[in-house]
Design a protein with these regions (language model features):
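Juxtamembrane/disordered regions of integral membrane proteins
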Residues: 1-138
Length: 138
């Protein structure tokens, strides 16, 4: 099992990385989408901070709690990241649709709101990788 200091280190790193991703989105969103209100930008910042926390916590589990199979960092981080952003896409489909059309255009290849699921997979795997490497115990 993981010690308390490694656990807290993992949480701090996960939340920090999530906050950094959210901050990036907070400042880049107005560059790509004109007249975007402050609420979705703040929501994005809070979402990815929570996202980093959840990915960091799930990285503490070596085995699936119910099914019992091994869960390496790349599996838990990518699956949890994709799942979290799938929930985001389902809840805010209309808002994401308008945003994605604003970024990629009406006929753009990546205009579907469900591309945020792939984004979540990549960001989740990245956060899981960094938190796993940084919280290893000697």
């Amino acid at each position: 099992m993981i010690s308390e200091s490694a656990f807290m280190k993992r949480i701090v790193i996960g939340k920090s990385l999530g906050f950094a991703v959210g901050l990036l989105g907070f400042f880049l969103l107005p560059v790509f989408v004109e007249h975007i209100p402050m609420m979705p930008r703040l929501g994005l910042l809070c979402w990815y901070t929570t996202f980093g926390f959840v990915v960091a916590i799930t990285g503490c589990l070596d085995r699936h709690p119910v099914l019992g199979f091994a869960m390496p960092w790349w599996l838990s981080g990518s699956v949890m990241g994709a799942w979290l952003n799938l929930v985001l896409a389902l809840m805010f489909y209309d808002t994401l649709d308008v945003t994605m059309v604003g970024i990629f255009g009406e006929d753009g290849l990546l205009r579907s709101p469900f591309w945020v699921v792939v984004e979540g997979l990549i960001i989740g795997a990245t956060i899981a990788f960094v938190t796993d490497r940084a919280s290893k115990e000697a």
